[in-house]
Regions:
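Glycine-rich phosphate-binding loop signature in dinucleotide/nucleotide-binding domains
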Residues: 7, 91-94, 143-149
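Anion (oxyanion) recognition and catalysis
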Residues: 32, 86-90, 164
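Metal-dependent phosphoesterase signature
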Residues: 37-39, 45-86, 92
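Acidic, Mg2+-coordinating phosphoryl-transfer loop and its flanking beta/alpha structural elements
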Residues: 149-181
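Substrate-recognition "cap/lid" segment bordering the active-site pocket of phosphatases
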Residues: 99-151, 157
Length: 181
């Protein structure tokens, strides 16, 4: 994967989980397999600990464990993301750069890249993995300088705002947890 000699206006920056891949579905199945049940109204909660009636710390540990498991390499596409990513790439020559707070584990990154390639072909030219749950404000400042006015697609409102502050065009993917944004 590389970004050499690409038209900067044909690059779309995107989060992965909750935008391109259906992380929630994979995580829900994994949690159920491990004996955890969601609380009522879970679909409106972003915090995983709250979704499963546990502390935020316990929820974050389980997220990290899931993100570094083999299951992370087999997530399905979110809604119609596969259709539109492939259409933008194949018919309009767009390339995608993924910025995700997945994990710093190299095996997790390998599985993420493999999952994206299997579903999206060669649409993704780079996958940047930050630590599990890491903020994206600093990296978005860097990418806002490199790709000013390019699209930034995300499902977490504060990350959309950080992208806009960095000079990117922010698009929020709708989920129950961000309906009040």
């Amino acid at each position: 994967m590389g970004v050499k000699n690409m038209k900067k206006d044909k690059i779309i920056l995107t989060d992965c989980d909750g935008v391109i891949l259906d992380w929630e579905e994979g995580f829900s199945v994994w949690m159920e397999h491990h004996g955890h049940k969601k609380v009522e109204g879970y679909q409106f909660l972003y915090n995983i600990g709250q979704r499963y009636g546990m502390s935020s710390e316990a929820g974050n540990k389980l997220v990290k464990q899931f993100n570094e498991s083999a299951a992370i390499g087999f997530l399905p596409p979110l809604r119609d993301a596969q259709f539109f990513v492939k259409k933008l790439h194949e018919q309009h020559q767009y390339k995608f750069i993924c910025i995700t707070s997945l994990s710093l584990d190299p095996y997790a990154k390998y599985l993420r890249e493999r999952n994206l390639k299997k579903l999206m072909g060669d649409a993704f030219i780079d996958v940047i993995c930050l630590d599990t749950g890491a903020d994206k404000d600093k990296i978005l400042k860097d990418y806002g300088i490199k790709y000013p006015n390019n699209y930034w697609i995300e499902d977490k409102p504060e990350n959309v705002d950080w992208g806009i502050d960095a000079g990117l065009k922010g698009i929020l993917i709708e989920h129950g947890h961000n309906m009040d944004y």
